[in-house]
Amino acid sequence: MSSNQQPVVVGKIGSTYGVKGWMKITAYTDSVEGIFDYSPWFLKEHGEWREVKVSQWRFHGKAVVAELEGVSNREQAQMLTNCEIGILAEQMPELPEDEFYWRDLIGCEVLNTKGYNLGKVDQILETGSNDVLMVKANAKDAFGKTERMIPYLPDQFVLEVKLSEKQIIVDWDPDF
């Protein structure tokens, strides 16, 4: 992995499972087992990414557990608890032209229908009912806002996504 590539986070290491170095895995993929479609993984430890390989995995109830190469006991596994699991962006499936990954929206300018710049997408929250764009307002926001939370509801609030221009057009009152 080159130094300018940042892995795409697809999960997180959970607590240990047993005494032989197995770990519970929290997957952010569509299906919990989908995280194992990607290899290698990169783990973020102490702010640094390092490559790891999954030796084996299995279902544990509705969840999954995994064993990583080089991790053979509970103590080693505990050191990895809460580490993010990343993959290289090029490992992800290519999408049709009119679709995108949430990560593609990070950094996009958000403009309302009147052309007011509401700020840039800082992150996206998954709330269960609908996802929410967290928009960091510009430093000199005329309405004194520092952040806006805009529900990602196409046709209702999110009218257009222009990825080539890194812009999202929304129907949103800048004072809200």
UniProtKB/Swiss-Prot annotation:
Q: Name one GO molecular function term.
A: ribosome binding
Keyword Cytoplasm carried by entry: yes
SUPFAM superfamilies, A to Z: PRC-barrel domain, Translation proteins
How is this protein annotated for GO cellular component?
cytoplasm; ribosome
Query: What is the protein name for this chain?
Result: Ribosome maturation factor RimM
* Any single biological process term in GO: rRNA processing
Q: In this record, what's one Pfam family?
A: PRC
Fill in the domain comment.
Answer: The PRC barrel domain binds ribosomal protein uS19.
Q: Which UniProt keywords apply?
A: Chaperone, Cytoplasm, Ribosome biogenesis, rRNA processing
Question: In which broad location class does this protein mainly occur, judging by the first location in its UniProt entry?
Answer: cytoplasm
What family is reported?
Belongs to the RimM family.
What organism does the UniProt record list as the source? Answer: Shewanella amazonensis (strain ATCC BAA-1098 / SB2B)
Domain (PRC barrel) spans 97-176
The role this protein plays is: An accessory protein needed during the final step in the assembly of 30S ribosomal subunit, possibly for assembly of the head region. Essential for efficient processing of 16S rRNA. May be needed both before and after RbfA during the maturation of 16S rRNA. It has affinity for free ribosomal 30S subunits but not for 70S ribosomes.
Sorted alphabetically, which HAMAP family does this protein's record hold? Ribosome_mat_RimM
Chaperone keyword on record: yes
Q: How does it assemble?
A: Binds ribosomal protein uS19.
Q: Which InterPro entries match?
A: PRC-brl_dom, PRC_barrel-like_sf, RimM, RimM_N, RimM_N_sf, Transl_B-barrel_sf
Subcellular localization is given as: Cytoplasm
UniProt-listed PANTHER family? RIBOSOME MATURATION FACTOR RIMM
